[in-house]
Every structure is written in structure tokens, then in C-alpha cells.
Amino acid sequence: VKKSIITSIILIVLLASGYYFWNKPTAKNETQTKDNPISDSTKNHENEVDTAFLKSVFELDDSYDYNSDSLLTQGEDNTAGVSQDAFAGQSRINIALIGLDGRMGATTGHADANHILSIMPDIGKIQIISIPRDTYVDCGYDDTTHLNKLTVYYMAAGRQSYLKKLAEIAKLQSIPYYIEFGFSQAMGVMSLFGYKSSETLQVLRSRKSFAIGDYQRVYNQAQFVKQLMVRHYNTLTGTFQPVFINGILALVRTNMKYSEISNIFSKLEQNKFTASPENISIKIRPSLKANYKVFDFSNPEMIAQMKQQLGLDRIAKRDTTAFTPTNFTKYLEKKLTKIIITAAKDTLKNPQLAINKLKPTYEQKIWLQFDNDSLRNLYSKKMSDLLQRAYLRRKDTLSANRVKAAYIAEQDLFIKSKVR
């Protein structure tokens, strides 16, 4: 009888365990507690997202694991993940590159891409330091919420605290400069340099297809930046330097000025920065020693081939949570037109309300998601003109002039540039 009782107890425990694991609450339900009201929207995307490629931003759990022979690689990098830094002690100018993942019209977002341009002008070197978005950072939440990570810290603690934390992880003294951009700005810059923006971002955001996941992803992003700089550096420093620098500054949020960037370029050239592509190196923090795959991102055709090999369209089609308009161009036109019409009504009686309605969408440069140049220029002008009028109604000529200057710089960038 005793043996039978023990056997029954064991059986009950096994059945209870099985029921728990088969019916385990989702992470979404676990995080929605009274003490932890902030949900991880980096995983639970809402219906209206700031992206022209929509499904490409969703990364479904997929068991695909590609070896080095299944993709076209240029080799491997076995130094990016080592803890030692060959340039330790060098004088540096550190600039954070922050890619924000936010909804259309949102005033903030999670830090989805976290990179640092660590420039050493005295020796003609640039080190791109890349940090995975899910790197552990204490944000003040219980660890069971899965919210204690770098991507959440930006929103939870603010930009200045984020920059200090970024410097700590990267083992740098400080990061005085930042350049922030969202999906729209990223798409605009990529289109400017001849890339099919949605396709390129889809590849650069992919992590499920690699054995080391997010570490390979941030390395890919850093490698893309490196190859872009190598390929177009002469354009950025040649006759059209003012057009490119001022234009890009108009697209992003930054505390840098034209003169500062121009001086950095000049010092790098004086110290033979352009002599070799190897003057740009990549460092991964926290360190993870691995053989990072080096892919060719310099050619849009290669990116298209890589997208196909990774099966990203197949993965995107499996997503059932994304809101996907049948015609994205018409959808975006409708959204922007509605914002413009409602803000225009407020301009005369309540210009501050009009500014509040326009500013978030304006700062995200949502119109850059249009593939059509005419539509992009049309809505850029409509948004800029209306925002200028609202500022002038408040007698804020300084802000109005800034909006006007940014519009002119953007037009010069896309119309006068020879890269497109």
C-alpha cells in the first residue's frame, strides 16, 4: 500500500509539471503586473509601427541556423569579440549612434541599435563599438519581467544616463556626442546611398538565422557602417561635403555641429585615414570571442541575395500579429494628411496645439518612408510649412527658421546629391 501511495504521488507530480510547462503563461502576461506597468514593446509590436517594411521588423523564433558555407561571406573576424583593445589609451572622440524603435508619432522609443563611433583622429583610426540591445542593465525591474536590458534603459533612464551606461559597457571614459535616428531616417539615408531601404533593414535586423544571434546582428550592422564609409568617404569629404553633412544633420537628432564633423574629417585625412579600409575596426561589447561572419553589404544585389538565402520573406509571412496595409503608400498618405488637416485647423486659434500634433511626426521624418520622390518632397514641404507657420504664430522665429533651414538642407541632400 505504501509503495502504491508513493507511486501515486510521483504520478501526480509528473502530471502537474507537464500541465505547467504545456500551459505556461506567456512573457506578455508575466510582465503586465501592477508593479511593472511597462511592457516590453520591443517584442510585442503594436498595430501601427513606424516602418515602411512592416513585417520585416518582426523576428519570429525560427530554428534555421546557417553555417559559413550557406551564405556568401568575405571571411571571418576573430578579433572583434576579444576583450583586449589594441587602441587602449588613445585619445578619442566618441559618438553614440542610437537607432530608436518607436511607433509613428511617438516622442520616444527603445534603443534598438546601439553603436559608438570611437574616432582617433591623431592616428587616423575609427573603431566601431557595437553592443547587443538585450545586454543586461539594471533598469529597476524584477528580473522575471525580462525588462532589465539596454534597449529598455534608454526609455526608462533617459538619454544622459543611457550614454553613461553605454560608455561603461564599452569601457570608454565618456560619450559626449550622440546621433539618434528612427526607421524613417534610416530608410532615407539608405535610399540616398542607393540601397533598397526596406530590404537592407530587413537583413540588418535579422538575428534568428545566426548561431550567435544578436552578437552577429550588431556585428553585421557595424560592418555595414564600415563598408558604407569606405565606399562613400570621398563623397562625404569632397565638393558636396556641406550638402551631405548639413543634409544628414537635418534628418537626425544630434548635438553635433557641421564644424565639429568637418574638423574630424580633416584630421582623419591628415593622418592617412583613407590609406586602408583596415583603419576602421569593429569591437563587440560585452566581449564574446567568436568567429564573426563578414558579409558583403557594399552591393545592393548581394543584400537581395542574402535576404533570399536567409529566408526572411518566409519568416515575415509567418507573422500574424503585424498590421499590414494592402497599399502602404496610400496608408501613409492618409495618416499624414489627417495629421496635417487637424493641425492646420489649430494653427490660427491654438498654434501650440498644432505644434504638439506636428512635432513628433516631423522629428521622425515619416515622409522618408515613401519610395516615390515626389510624394516624399510633397509631404516634407507640407509638414515643414505648416510647422513654420505655427511657430510664427507664437512669435518663435528661431524655431521657425530652424525648420526652414532643415527643409532646405534636406532638399539639397536628396535633389543635388550625385549618389542617388
Located regions from the model:
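Positively charged n-region of N-terminal signal peptides that target proteins for export
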Residues: 1-4
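Non-catalytic, solvent-exposed segments at the cell envelope interface
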Residues: 16-420
